[in-house]
UniProtKB/Swiss-Prot annotation:
It comes from Listeria innocua serovar 6a (strain ATCC BAA-680 / CLIP 11262). HAMAP family: SecA. This is Protein translocase subunit SecA 2. It is a peripheral membrane protein. Its main location: membrane. One of its GO terms (molecular function) is ATP binding. The gene is secA2.
Length: 776
């Protein structure tokens, strides 16, 4: 994207600072390693008591620049230093691919460590984390900064050691899962993650935007009648188009009156929306989503009898990841493979809410400006476009637009064939496995050798991308496979025009299109890009517009059948409009996800805070006597204020509180006593029994029981919140705002959760045996 006025103003401001940094290169030239490390220690100590000035910043950058020059032979140029200064301000730096974002990261990490912050560097995958840790990590270590790699599969002691480092490389999911696991431990000493000071996110658009729709989940198996999925599959297979309404771009489908009648007859229920039919309704809706919204070889792939999710932004399969809340089981039933048990959520957080917990956040990527509003609204980060060091030498051609996919296919083959004949390497980008395999079959038929990269062979990704810049190589890849790695050109390819990029469809996001184009023309290399699209492409097929339908019909009716592209400003404007609308719709989905998660996020923070305090003190925050008194008063005295018809549930509550405990007064006797007297008897008896045990023993027992109950009830509460959210969306076509309903009913569920674990803790207190153990 081009710079706007604000970008130019910021870049101009920082350009002079960057030039001063370069002019300082002689300052540290004659120092040996020990002397450079002394400088590092000097700055670290200074900023423990004093603020950092602009002059300090210039000297610190110059120190890191000298170290990079010595260790990896790279002298940071002015634009890289400008980018680092932007990152230091907590912004997103948009820097073209190949311009040196990895080196740029060195400076902001080094200066944040000097400020006393622990730094997390987040990358898109473990391969990139390992690569960057090795390259930039050695520079930081040369200066006396400790660096670690946070990988999956490490044990607790290894994780604890990693989190003592000044700079830690890893993936978003690994940092997020460490946070969730830390809030499931039984002892304070078992926590591994230290403070969340500063995080720098590479490929920030991919992690903070594209991955934001998928929450991080820790789960276990949930008992469920899996045969219901196959049964519901039979129902959905019989449905006609008249049975449901669909808004595919919003990923929403619902039953109309005819569909409701069909489903009620199938399940044998009077009302599909009654409490008795909740399970049948839920699984029916899941199978409808699986059949009508989830598409094989686009949203998922079936390999070796297993359904694998396809990352919509990279085209990669995601082994081990499953769609949430029964959708994966529904797809398995649809595809006729084994339906595996649904998972039960033990802990969850969205990418958005995890990273918003850091004190400071910044990001870098090749494409972010189109999503600036989202970065600003959700993460409070502006996007600044950093100029390139060398002029971009890529020729970006206008789109070739064809009436049909068939005509487009023929034109793509012709375009690729003549480039192949002259030896120019070509990268063909597709949006799905289906279109990837279709183009591959056309190239095969034309006798054009090529390599294919999609979710079905992602294991060979690095090898395939490494060959993509070779003379005469044709590479066919889904979306942005290979992002984060350079396509290096053979020396003799430059005179052939560099790498040619052919896009076969416009994507839902303009940003993904820009990423594909950005694979070519790096660091001043020559290059070429062009999109070859048709009126039958998915983007336009799902674009609901009467004016477009009218224009499309008119164009197809008048279309000359010569296979030549049509150049129409109207079509171009429709495509841009479609992308903007879909970007807006996807942003709304992510914003909606965040709005709902903020309800559970507030609750999660309250629970985790209480948990932390419990682990820190190693005992209850309030006395067990106080909790028992509150529960007893609510169970016995509160009902005095109620009407007769409300009393029944309190009789059951009283019985449950005392039933099976060691409390010496029988329930029959209790019902004849004054409620206030009952409460005092309960509290007095507990106090007497508690005093029989050593203080350390009873304190440890109370802490362990309280923690157990809170954790168990929290898992049940998370499940209840999932069910509530699903139900709320099914009621979304009523008069009430579903989010407001979710907030209100979610708060009620949270109050119930708190009351429940206090109640069962009080019950457990009355079960203490003489040995100080809890029975039951």
């Amino acid at each position: 994207m081009r710079q706007n006025y604000d970008d130019r103003k910021i870049v101009k401001q920082y350009r002079e600072i960057a030039r001063q940094i370069v002019r300082k290169e002689g300052l540290y030239k004659n120092m040996d390693q020990d002397e450079l490390r002394e400088q590092t220690n000097f700055w670290r100590e200074k900023f423990k008591t004093k603020p950092m000035t602009e002059r300090d910043k210039i000297n610190i950058f110059a120190l890191a620049r000298e170290a990079a020059s010595r260790i990896i032979g790279l002298d940071a140029v002015v634009v890289q230093l400008i980018g680092a200064l932007v990152l230091g301000d907590g912004k997103v730096a948009e820097m073209k691919t190949g311009e040196g974002k990895t080196l740029m990261s060195l400076f902001v990490m080094f200066i944040e460590v000097m400020r006393g912050n622990r730094v997390h560097l987040v990358t898109a995958n473990e391969y990139l984390a390992r690569r960057d840790r090795e390259e930039i990590g050695q520079v930081l270590e040369y200066l006396g900064i400790s660096v670690a790699l946070n990988e999956s599969g490490l044990d607790k002691d290894q994780k604890k050691a990693i989190y003592t480092a000044d700079v830690i490389y890893g993936t978003a999911s690994e940092f997020g899962f460490d946070y969730l696991r830390d809030n499931m431990v039984r002892q304070k000493e078992d926590k591994v993650q230290s403070g969340l000071d500063f995080v720098l996110i590479d490929e920030a658009d991919s992690i903070l935007i594209d991955e934001a729709r998928t929450p991080l989940l820790i789960s276990d198996r949930k008992e469920e009648d899996l045969s219901l999925y196959q049964t519901a599959n039979e129902l959905v297979q019989t449905m006609m188009k008249d049975d449901y309404e669909i808004e595919e771009h919003k990923r929403f489908v619902w039953l109309n009156d005819a569909g409701i009648e069909r489903a009620q007859k199938f399940w044998g229920v009077e009302s599909l929306y009654s409490a008795e039919a909740q399970v049948e309704l839920r699984i029916t809706m899941l199978l409808m989503r699986a059949h009508f919204l989830m598409h094989k070889d686009k949203d998922y792939v079936v390999l070796d009898g297993e359904v694998l999710i396809i990352d919509p932004h990279t085209g990669r399969a995601l082994p081990g990841r499953r769609f949430n809340d029964g959708l994966h089981q529904a797809i398995e039933a649809k595809e006729g493979v084994e339906v595996k048990e649904e998972s039960r959520t033990l802990a969850t957080i969205t990418i958005q809410n995890y990273f918003r917990m850091y004190k400071r956040l910044s990001g870098m990527t090749g494409t972010a400006k189109t999503e600036e509003e989202e970065f600003r609204q959700i993460y409070n980060m502006d996007v600044v476009v950093i100029p390139t060091n060398l002029r971009v030498n890529r020729e970006d051609m206008p789109d070739d637009i064809f009436y049909t996919k068939k005509e487009k296919g023929r034109a793509i083959v012709y375009e690729v064939s003549w480039r192949y004949e002259k030896g120019q390497p070509t990268l063909i980008g597709t949006s799905s496995i289906k279109s990837n395999e279709w183009i591959s079959s056309l190239l095969d038929a034309a006798g054009i050798p090529h390599q294919v990269l999609n979710a079905k062979n992602h294991a060979q990704e690095a090898e395939i991308i490494a060959k993509a810049g070779k003379r005469g190589m044709v590479t066919l890849a889904t979306n942005m496979a290979g992002r984060g790695t350079d396509i290096k050109l053979d020396p003799d390819v430059h005179k052939l025009g560099g790498l040619a990029v052919i896009g076969t469809e416009r994507h839902e996001s303009r940003r993904i299109d820009l990423q594909l184009m950005g694979r070519s023309g790096r660091r001043g290399d020559p290059g070429f890009s062009k999109f070859m699209i048709s009126l039958e492409d998915d983007l336009l097929e799902q674009f609901e517009s009467k004016s477009w339908e009218k224009l499309s019909t008119k164009l197809k009716r008048k279309a000359p059948r010569d296979g030549k592209p049509v150049n129409s400003r109207k079509i171009h404007s429709v495509i841009v409009d479609a992308q903007k609308r879909l970007e807006g719709a996807n942003y709304d989905i992510r914003k909606d996800l965040l709005s709902y998660d903020e309800v559970i996020d507030l609750q999660r923070k309250m629970v985790y805070k209480e948990r932390d305090q419990l682990l820190e003190r190693n005992k209850l925050g309030v006395s067990s006597e106080k909790i028992l008194r509150e529960v007893a008063e609510y169970s016995f005295i509160h009902p005095l204020e109620l009407e007769e018809e409300e009393l029944e549930k309190y009789y059951s509550r009283q019985k449950e509180l005392l039933g099976g405990t060691k409390f010496p007064i029988s329930f029959d006797q209790v019902t004849l006593m004054d409620p206030v007297e009952v409460v005092e008897e309960i509290v007095a008896w507990h106090k007497k029994e508690r005093n029989k045990f050593p203080v350390e023993t009873i304190t440890a027992i109370e802490k362990e029981v309280y923690l157990n109950l809170m954790d168990q009830m929290w898992v049940m509460h998370l499940d209840a919140m999932v069910q509530l959210r699903e139900g709320i969306h099914l009621r979304a076509y009523g008069q009430q705002d579903p989010l407001v309903m979710y907030q209100k009913e979610g708060a009620q569920l949270f109050e119930k959760f708190q009351a429940d674990y206090h109640f069962y803790f009080a019950h457990a207190l009355l079960e203490l045996d003489p040995d100080g153990l809890i029975q039951g």
